Amino acid sequence: MVSWAEFETAAPEIAKEGRRLLYARGDAEALLATVRGDGLPRIHPINVGVVDDRLYAFLLPSAKRSDLEQDGRYALHTHQDPAAPDEFSVRGRAHVVDDGAIRARVADAWSFEVDDTYLLVELSVEHAVLGLRGADEWPPRYRRWSKTPSD
């Protein structure tokens, strides 16, 4: 599992811009893609957060939660502003966090109140893509990072 901190050490500029884009609207909001039980993709809006240098999400009982509990694979893509259409995406696997102390620290830093119905997952950062461009520029200038060179 690759934490946000490990990703940030390996690719500091991509991580810095990625964090900026995740938090561009204040709270870290993005689109989460998961893999359904039948293998088809599913996409959902979600709040995420980088807390203690790890990427987390709290999930209520839902299709996205079931997908992550059953399969774990995910992709996360930031929202885009048409006036400044930079983009950032990561993909990897979600891991359920059972440690009560970690859950309490993450909940304290979260943008909304969570209770016991929420499942906490850490999102491993195994691949990241940053696309930078002005509103009138095409194509974007992409930078990529992967935990393995073949990705």
Provide a role label for each language-model segment.
Residues V2-A30:
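Short, basic/aromatic recognition patches
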Residues D27-P61, L68, Y74-Q80, F88-V90:
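Short beta-strand segments
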Residues P61-S62, D71-H77, I102-E113:
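Short acidic (Asp/Glu) patches
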Residues R25-A28, P41-I43, D116-Y118, V125:
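Short gly/pro-enriched beta-turn/loop segments at secondary-structure junctions
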Residues P61-K64, E126:
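A generic "binding-loop/recognition-motif" signal
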Residues M1-E13, A84-D151:
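Charged, gly/pro-rich active-site loop segments
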